[in-house]
Amino acid sequence: MPKRTDIRKIMVIGSGPIVIGQAAEFDYSGTQACLSLKEEGYQVVLVNSNPATIMTDKDIADKVYIEPITLEFVTRILRKERPDALLPTLGGQTGLNMAMALSKNGILEELNVELLGTKLSAIDKAEDRDLFKQLMEELNQPIPESEIVNSVEEAIQFAEQIGYPLIVRPAFTLGGTGGGMCDNQEQLVDITTKGLKLSPVTQCLIERSIAGFKEIEYEVMRDAADNALVVCNMENFDPVGIHTGDSIVFAPAQTLSDVENQLLRDASLDIIRALKIEGGCNVQLALDPNSFKYYVIEVNPRVSRSSALASKATGYPIAKLAAKIAVGLTLDEVINPITKTTYAMFEPALDYVVAKMPRFPFDKFESGDRKLGTQMKATGEVMAIGRNIEESLLKACRSLEIGVDHIKIADLDNVSDDVLLEKIRKAEDDRLFYLAEALRRHYSIEKLASLTSIDSFFLDKLRVIVELEDLLSKNRLDINILKKVKNKGFSDKAIASLWQINEDQVRNMRKEAGILPVYKMVDTCAAEFDSATPYFYSTYAVENESLISDKASILVLGSGPIRIGQGVEFDYATVHSVKAIRESGFEAIIMNSNPETVSTDFSISDKLYFEPLTFEDVMNVIDLEKPEGVILQFGGQTAINLAKDLNKAGVKILGTQLEDLDRAENRKQFEATLQALNIPQPPGFTATTEEEAVNAAQKIGYPVLVRPSYVLGGRAMKIVENEEDLRHYMTTAVKASPDHPVLIDAYLIGKECEVDAISDGQNILIPGIMEHIERAGVHSGDSMAVYPPQTLSETIIETIVDYTKRLAIGLNCIGMMNIQFVIKDQKVYVIEVNPRASRTLPFLSKVTHIPMAQVATKVILGDKLCNFTYGYDLYPASDMVHIKAPVFSFTKLAKVDSLLGPEMKSTGEVMGSDINLQKALYKAFEAAYLHMPDYGNIVFTVDDTDKEEALELAKVYQSIGYRIYATQGTAIYFDANGLETVLVGKLGENDRNHIPDLIKNGKIQAVINTVGQNNIDNHDALIIRRSAIEQGVPLFTSLDTAHAMFKVLESRAFTLKVLD
């Protein structure tokens, strides 16, 4: 079937901010889809609220709207653009839900906009739990015994009929949001209440738990001519009961017999045909390990996280082809872009094993509930490719960047057997490491299989690794054993540890013995056809398939898995850097380990190495490719942390040199640099012991800001107000040592702002200054940033520009740098300097129209700023106001406190732009799903130090029609100062009128809660914040953010005046 000619303009809805359950995979799929549609000659209009994406670059679609993905704004854009069609299946759950809302509100019908790809009825049948159940029954496809409920009472009634355990699955939510496992009525009531609240259609499916079955996924494609194929099947290491996004996954499936594979494959193809899905679809199935009995768990009628994984695992570009199918092309007429000789109708074949491992945020959220279940908790993932399971698993392990290079974590030797077995039974994020430890202690596979329901086949592969560890320990420096373990994916570092020598010795020994990796091609066809893909993975085998060209090359290191503090922004910078390298006439080589991102799309670079970002793996690529140099600036802390070892190995690091990176990161050197440049900084000291820290704090005076050196995202950063808290911090939060000093600074309460700059060694370009709405003390990544600055005087701006120039030249920066300032009493202090790309780069690139990563890369390669058209120093400010607002994933992370402070907690960001601050703020809050009505009830429960300021804030909220509720201490202060309040209790006080109940019953429209540093662990305040998060009530833990929201509400309010 030829492509459709009756449509010309197509709107694509993106997935919005990155949250747990919906990450960078949708930037990858959305970018692919937009380019695919443009390739076919269609005009593409894109709507997305996330500025950190490649998808929202001007050249990806014909028209790009970075606007809130809400019914109000998408409708306005539809009315303005009048597209012929809408493609909603590439924007994750956000895109699907928006399409449903547009349809239900009659907008699509009114504007005559057709839905492309999957029809609304199919989305409904897959997403609406009741319709899905009916369809499965019609197809004779087995599903677990279940009931659709719209109330908690109905859930209890069903539970009484069939008993526990049960699983709750809310309709139309993402990443298992609001769902969970229930072993009793109390849990059922709690989870169902939350689930009904979070489901946009107030509907949950309550089903019999089939926890313990094998979880298998099929990624399938279908076109309008009913051609359908399986792109890839995948098997979860963890059984049903743990969300697939939180599970280790292998592709292809490893333990299925031919009969089982055929059974599940047929079911998946029957389902996609019955739903008449046109495009990609993910089918999740549960298989009884002891029989051929299976159940269909769910169907995602769209491109998903698993689609991105399947695309990278096979090389088959699902989103690109789904877009072509949506406009009428069929699989048998589209050429496979990898082989360039076969058609997309050929099912991919794999001659390797892919392992995906989730990356969890518990290194930042130590208080978080680590127990895994049906609600997703991972922020990102890594993928590794090997010739056997052991190799791919160990490569994935060391890609995670959690301080491990093997299936062993520190201090496990000291764990008692009881604790070990309990950790294995509980299924937390680190269970894999405890399983390996149990095997080291000779627990049987049968025992571990019965405790975990993990297939014995996988446990046996872990045993192989453990037995090889033993073999290594008993045969020190044995070359044959070395060869054997390298074939199974052991790292040089792990071998060095077992042999009690250093990594360099293992590396040299291996190279002398000729034990070197070769690089194999990912070609979708198991080498059956010729392939032109420059997409490689390492393995210890014969025949290297990565051919070296005569062209001079540059290697760019990516940023690895998405985690809090290092998100998709760094991937954005990496992709733009590669573009500039290619434009400059070099061969661009990318090395990265993240299957979700645009940078690991094989068509972006001249060569892609899908490998862990460790010294060993990077050096192996460098030894083969011999690039002119390596660029580290765009890979976040991941790449920067490799600088020292790469430099020592004689690798040419392009851009700012190691000694200058050290001058920015090393406290004493940085202080000396600032003194020499005559730039003020808050007084501070370095401490390597607890006593040094206490002495430093006494000299500075409390409060002090304490943090470890060399971190990203404010990891383990804290404001400390007394000696007791400081001693507690030094003994629990950090392990201070001469190699890992702790930085102790005076905490200045002032206005914070930051600058991204590009330096060529002689001149600098500052695209813009961003002013933070929240005062210093809230991490810059969690602050709302405004560009251009709204309250900074000309003198302050001139000082910031002057200090930026001095620092860029003084630190010999070549390329990107980010500087953070605090302004107190009209004096500018430098807080920190990062001589690399920062997370604000995409936002600033979008709003200034300066492709910063590209300019910086060309400067790194030797170009000068005078050769560009942007001039020097501060670039002229935009006449619009732009706001970057953080987005959080607290609903997914039980026990994680939502109180903002110096340690970063946000997972994503949105942008709001308009002609003035109030309108831009309104859009930013709406895009971040922080909506407040024009009037209602607002609770104040604030720290003593904030009461004076909170009083003024409460007065203005009252002036626009809000009723002020307050807890006792706050209410007494407000009443004494002439403000009438409604007294409410915290917990256990004023039983009928305490805050969590009021929130639950919909009586409260917003909560303002600030806490002094000494009361951070206050249990009542924690529960109040948690209640607000769980019920979706706007929560402000900074008075500055609450004041910004007031400005929005005030701008929407009319003035009511009595006639004089």
Swiss-Prot record:
Chain segments carrying region Carboxyphosphate synthetic domain: 1-401
Binding residues annotated for Mg(2+) 1, in chain numbering: Q284, E298
Reaction catalyzed: hydrogencarbonate + L-glutamine + 2 ATP + H2O = carbamoyl phosphate + L-glutamate + 2 ADP + phosphate + 2 H(+)
One GO CC annotation: cytoplasm
Residue intervals of the MGS-like domain: 930-1060
Cofactor binding, per record: Binds 4 Mg(2+) or Mn(2+) ions per subunit.
Its job: Large subunit of the glutamine-dependent carbamoyl phosphate synthetase (CPSase). CPSase catalyzes the formation of carbamoyl phosphate from the ammonia moiety of glutamine, carbonate, and phosphate donated by ATP, constituting the first step of 2 biosynthetic pathways, one leading to arginine and/or urea and the other to pyrimidine nucleotides.
Protein name: Carbamoyl phosphate synthase large chain
